[in-house]
Amino acid sequence: MYEPTLTVESFDSELAGAIRDERRRQEHHVELIASENYVSPRVLELQGSVLTNKYAEGYPGRRYYGGCEFVDIAEQLAIDRAKELFVADYANVQPHSGSQANAEAYMALMNPGDTLLAMDLSHGGHLTHGSPVSFSGKFYKAVHYGLNAHGDIDYEQAAQLAQEHKPKVILAGFSAFSGIVDWQRFREIADSVNAYFMTDIAHVAGLVAAGVYPSPVQIADVTTTTTHKTLRGPRAGLILAKANPELEKRLNSAVFPGSQGGPLMHIIAAKAVAFKEAMQPEFKTYAQQILKNAKAMAEVMKERGYTIVSGGTQNHLFLVSLLDKNISGKEAEAALGRANITVNKNTVPGETRSPFVTSGLRIGTPAITTRGFKEKEASQLAHWVCDILDDIHNEKVIADVKQKAHELCGKFPVYQELD
């Protein structure tokens, strides 16, 4: 049924209700999931634009369909801005997600059965870094390094494993590591075994773009990322690289036609405007505040007796180990959720529970910083988290924190006040 004037509200009240409720949840809950953020109204607008109607297989100026002259402009803007923002020589803005960007980079760099050396999932890596349940662990032989006793990346272990297994690709990147990666050291390890060096900066891309976290783009052969999280764009992927014409051709072919068909032009346009937003001076201030808020929260939780993996944070997130608290990550996530504080359970080094239960929490500050929280609010919030974890079955404490969280959110609306 095509009716240009019919709204979702009037046509599909069930779906409209779910979206309305989700918007209320986002307004009234404190978002501490490290991979989530709030996009700008401009990004929202473009994701619902008429560009969603256009098929555009191929690349700007080399399409398989006619009528692409205007989407070519949008995609070229996204490419040029990505290259400028990240100081890259090459950018492919077509990947639909970070996982697909990784798959496409692997396709360009490896053959099935080749060896991938990456960070262990339980130490802060990602499913697509060679987990046995992921395509990356099924199609490639994955070997993993982890963290040392000090909570830092064990570079010596990585170097030893590289010499032992001679991987085709060495990957540096993470989904739950709160330190700073020594990209150059990984470059040297990769060079020692003639491996490609690939980085996944999905979590810190916004921090890298703002210059508050070291960039690997001109150190690595290939860099992948998502465009949401700290970058605050649409949920999608991006591949970057330093100059290498042969590798650029392989990357383009791996994306299209290797693993994708028609690109999502409305999402690519949203990427373009998000990249422009990240070029503004205000974005650097935002990224700096993300770090300040994360440090403030981690310090409070340490003072309250909670173990922070790696001892603290130098980016937007930190891991709380509950191994010594007789609390599971699942229990903690649920209790905090009842108080309108959204976090995610996470595996931690020395994990004894299943990935569906875990012994830790991952906490991140990109979303609360977008709302306008500063150190005062971040510290206050950390105390509330500790209040609940200190007495996790005390529903009175949970109700009290819920009321405080609701009031705090009211002072910092995401988009606008709701009924």
Curated annotation (Swiss-Prot):
HAMAP family recorded for this chain? SHMT
Q: Which reaction does it catalyse?
A: (6R)-5,10-methylene-5,6,7,8-tetrahydrofolate + glycine + H2O = (6S)-5,6,7,8-tetrahydrofolate + L-serine
Q: Cellular location of this protein?
A: Cytoplasm
Q: Which residues carry this modification: N6-(pyridoxal phosphate)lysine?
A: 229
| GO aspect biological process, one term | glycine biosynthetic process from serine
- GO terms under cellular component: cytosol
**Alphabetically ordered keywords of this record:** Amino-acid biosynthesis, Cytoplasm, One-carbon metabolism, Pyridoxal phosphate, Transferase
The protein's gene is named glyA
Function recorded in the entry = Catalyzes the reversible interconversion of serine and glycine with tetrahydrofolate (THF) serving as the one-carbon carrier. This reaction serves as the major source of one-carbon groups required for the biosynthesis of purines, thymidylate, methionine, and other important biomolecules. Also exhibits THF-independent aldolase activity toward beta-hydroxyamino acids, producing glycine and aldehydes, via a retro-aldol mechanism.
**Gene Ontology terms for molecular function:** glycine hydroxymethyltransferase activity; pyridoxal phosphate binding
The pathway is: One-carbon metabolism; tetrahydrofolate interconversion; Amino-acid biosynthesis; glycine biosynthesis; glycine from L-serine: step 1/1
Q: Which family does it belong to?
A: Belongs to the SHMT family.
> What CDD domains does its record include?
SHMT
Q: Could you say which EC number(s) this protein's record lists?
A: 2.1.2.1
How it assembles, according to the record, is: Homodimer.
Q: Which residues form a coiled coil?
A: none
Q: Which organism is it from?
A: Coxiella burnetii (strain RSA 331 / Henzerling II)
Q: Tell whether Cell cycle is among the UniProt keywords.
A: no
Annotated protein name in UniProt: Serine hydroxymethyltransferase
Essential cofactor(s): pyridoxal 5'-phosphate
